[in-house]
């Protein structure tokens, strides 16, 4: 998907962030307090690198015109590294805000492409609503941020044998060409 987007937009700059290779730390009470400081709070030196990483990830996300999220399904949901990234960019006043009418997304105007891999089949099946907490979660979060242009490319059934895997990957590859 990224390569097709670069071919159609040769001047585009790409920031590649491999969350499996360099996963952000998961939120805990100490980090959450530093991300949402009260008046007079001074972050401890030990958190400065985490806060800088958070700002880098958030700035990258906000500056992007297109965000491509590679999201394998792990036990019906997203990998914890992806959840940790989402926790870092979900910032009141930056990606969303609360109003008297309810939450309002502040990160609209961009396109999000979710490239999903799944060992089984979920889309369009009885399992979709009950067991697919991956795609629904990602759509909900991006929608909460105000993003409405969301495309999902699925490679489903990749653990269901060699033929099913080849078919799933071929179908997903064709979808990426249409997406660019």
Outline where the language-model segments fall.
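N-terminal beta1-alpha1-beta2 submodule of the flavodoxin-like/Rossmannoid cofactor-binding fold
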Residues: 1-71, 78-80, 84-87, 91, ...
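A generic structural signal for alpha->beta connector loops
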Residues: 11-13, 109, 147-149
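Hydrophobic/aromatic beta-strand patches that form the interior of the parallel beta-sheet core
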Residues: 15-17, 113-115, 151-153
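Short, glycine/serine-rich, charged loops/turns that create anion-binding
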Residues: 21, 119, 157
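Short catalytic/ligand-binding loop motif for oxyanion handling, primarily in non-cytosolic enzymes
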Residues: 23-26, 76-78, 122-124, 160-162
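Helix-loop-strand module that forms the ligand-binding subsite of alpha/beta enzymes
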Residues: 48-136
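Glycine-rich phosphate/pyrophosphate-binding loop and the adjoining helix
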Residues: 124-180
């Amino acid at each position: 998907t990224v390569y097709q987007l670069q071919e159609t937009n040769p001047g585009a700059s790409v920031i590649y962030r491999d969350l499996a290779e360099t996963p952000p730390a998961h939120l805990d009470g100490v980090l959450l307090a530093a991300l949402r400081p009260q008046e007079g709070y001074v972050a401890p030196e030990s958190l400065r690198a985490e806060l800088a990483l958070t700002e880098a990830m958030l700035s990258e996300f906000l500056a992007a015109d297109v965000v491509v999220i590679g999201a394998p399904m792990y036990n019906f949901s997203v990998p914890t590294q992806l959840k940790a990234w989402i926790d870092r960019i979900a910032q009141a006043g930056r990606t969303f805000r609360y109003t008297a009418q309810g939450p309002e997304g502040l990160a609209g105007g961009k396109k999000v492409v979710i490239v999903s891999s799944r060992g089984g089949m979920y889309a369009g099946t009885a399992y979709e609503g009950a067991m697919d907490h991956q795609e629904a979660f990602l759509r909900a979060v991006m929608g909460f941020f105000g993003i409405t242009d969301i495309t999902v490319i699925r490679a489903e059934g990749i653990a269901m044998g060699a033929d099913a895997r080849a078919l799933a990957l071929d179908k997903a590859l064709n979808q990426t060409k249409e997406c660019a």
